[in-house]
Amino acid sequence: MRAQWIARRHGQPNVTQMHHARRGSVTEEMAHVAAREKLDPELVRQEVARGRMVIPANLKHPELEPIAIGIAATCKINANIGNSAVTSDVDEELRKLSVCLRHGADTVMDLSTGGDIPLIRENILRHSPIPVGTVPIYECLAHVKDVVDLTPRGLLEIIEAQAAQGVDYMTIHAGVLRDIVPMAAGRITGIVSRGGALLARWMAANGQENPLYTHFDEICEIFKRYDVTFSLGDGLRPGCLADASDEAQFAELKVLGELTRKAWAHDVQVMVEGPGHVPLDQIPMNMQKERELCDEAPFYVLGPLVTDIAPGYDHITSAIGAAVAAQHGASMLCYVTPAEHLGLPDAEDVRQGIVAYKIAAHAADVARQRPGARDRDDALSRARYAFDWKRQFELSLDPDAARTKHDATLPQEAAKSAEFCSMCGPKFCSMRIHSHLGDGAAPGAALPCADAAPSQPTRAGGPLPIAR
């Protein structure tokens, strides 16, 4: 779809969406996302120029259908896939990608840490019409025996190779600095970001500053050549409620704000990653803090999980926090699956995580009163009142699940036109009863009254006592 758009920008000194937006140009990608979001293309251009919206769209990813991530757009969700050093299978990752696409993930991140990482990523990119993100330090680690052996040049080479392959956005943990890491020493769970922990160990062993920070301008130059979007990683995010909103988290966030402005000086797009595990009451404050420190760059949050006691159900604990975060300004939600904290998610875990987060994102869009956000809810409600079961299934977030649940107790085809489900049956279905009230159910109508005044309620042996 984008091949001709990309060809027209070939050879230009700066190809980024932000660069064109700041020059007053509405690119084809901007016009496309404006149509998808039902926004004025000029508003999209202004938001991209200001840095409040990003369109992750690497020139080397022509298969991509662009999307917008930002406060003016609908809330997006990301699904993580990728193998581990324990299990590696290209076909399984493509199955996961298929699940992501079928259930409506807006972006996908390949977090592979084992096997032939470039091959897995190449397959995902060539099959993905949605933006693909990565965490480059994972592949870097596959090239050395120990993280302490990483070199700045090796990091930059991997980043360049991934950009040239077509990766649309990359998590860069450039805010984990030597003077901030000790602030996490008193935490219950310490550093829970893999990238953050690896870089902390590298700095401790080498006695040098974070190479992603010291070479940030060089990374900007790479991103500028391909139009890769920064996803500034929160390497010091809290990993439990007790560690939330602490000194380390906000010290890193302040650095991420500085790096955001530095990337913008290169006309490179930026979104900022956020926590993590956060008590429900602290989420609005965390969203406000990011807006202040990072100049309203789109906030991309992992959950946050609002309780630590539910392994196996963390797609639920985190979706609760995600809905609140999105209501208060988060632009993209990184899903969590039932396998979180327990193991590598399979395709079914991926499906459950996506569905939970689609619900959270949609609930936030409704709460923020985005134009048209509630249209599907209202259409499904009308179908429900009309007992149009097939239409209800079609409008459902997960049609297969809705149909399966219904058919488990009423599998007959005749049940698809029945005015009841197996919960209430025909005698107790409130909507069926109401729909048969006739004229009395019309707006402004009054139900008919008996001519005589009601008699005092009685029971055998005398009148019922009246409570006072």
Swiss-Prot record:
Which GO molecular function terms does the record list?
4 iron, 4 sulfur cluster binding; carbon-carbon lyase activity; zinc ion binding
Stretches that traverse the bilayer = none
State the needed cofactors, names only: [4Fe-4S] cluster
Which top EC class is given? lyase
Q: Name one GO cellular component term.
A: cytosol
Q: Which domain of life is it from?
A: Bacteria
Sites binding substrate sit at 80, 109, 138, 173, 193-195, 234-237, 273, 300
A GO biological process this protein is involved in? thiamine biosynthetic process
Question: Keywords in UniProt for this one?
Answer: 4Fe-4S, Iron, Iron-sulfur, Lyase, Metal-binding, S-adenosyl-L-methionine, Thiamine biosynthesis, Zinc
User: Which Enzyme Commission number(s) are on file for it?
Assistant: 4.1.99.17
Note accompanying the cofactor annotation: Binds 1 [4Fe-4S] cluster per subunit. The cluster is coordinated with 3 cysteines and an exchangeable S-adenosyl-L-methionine.
Q: Which residues bind [4Fe-4S] cluster?
A: 421, 424, 429
Which positions are annotated as binding Zn(2+)?
Answer: 277, 341
Which pathway does the database say it acts in? Cofactor biosynthesis; thiamine diphosphate biosynthesis
Catalytic reaction list: 5-amino-1-(5-phospho-beta-D-ribosyl)imidazole + S-adenosyl-L-methionine = 4-amino-2-methyl-5-(phosphooxymethyl)pyrimidine + CO + 5'-deoxyadenosine + formate + L-methionine + 3 H(+)
Which InterPro entries does the entry link to? ThiC, ThiC/Bza_core_dom, ThiC/BzaA/B
Q: What does this protein do?
A: Catalyzes the synthesis of the hydroxymethylpyrimidine phosphate (HMP-P) moiety of thiamine from aminoimidazole ribotide (AIR) in a radical S-adenosyl-L-methionine (SAM)-dependent reaction.
Q: How does it assemble?
A: Homodimer.
Q: Which family does it belong to?
A: Belongs to the ThiC family.
Q: What is this protein called?
A: Phosphomethylpyrimidine synthase
Q: Which organism is it from?
A: Anaeromyxobacter sp. (strain Fw109-5)
At the highest ranks, the source species' classification is:
Bacteria, Pseudomonadati, Myxococcota, Myxococcia, Myxococcales
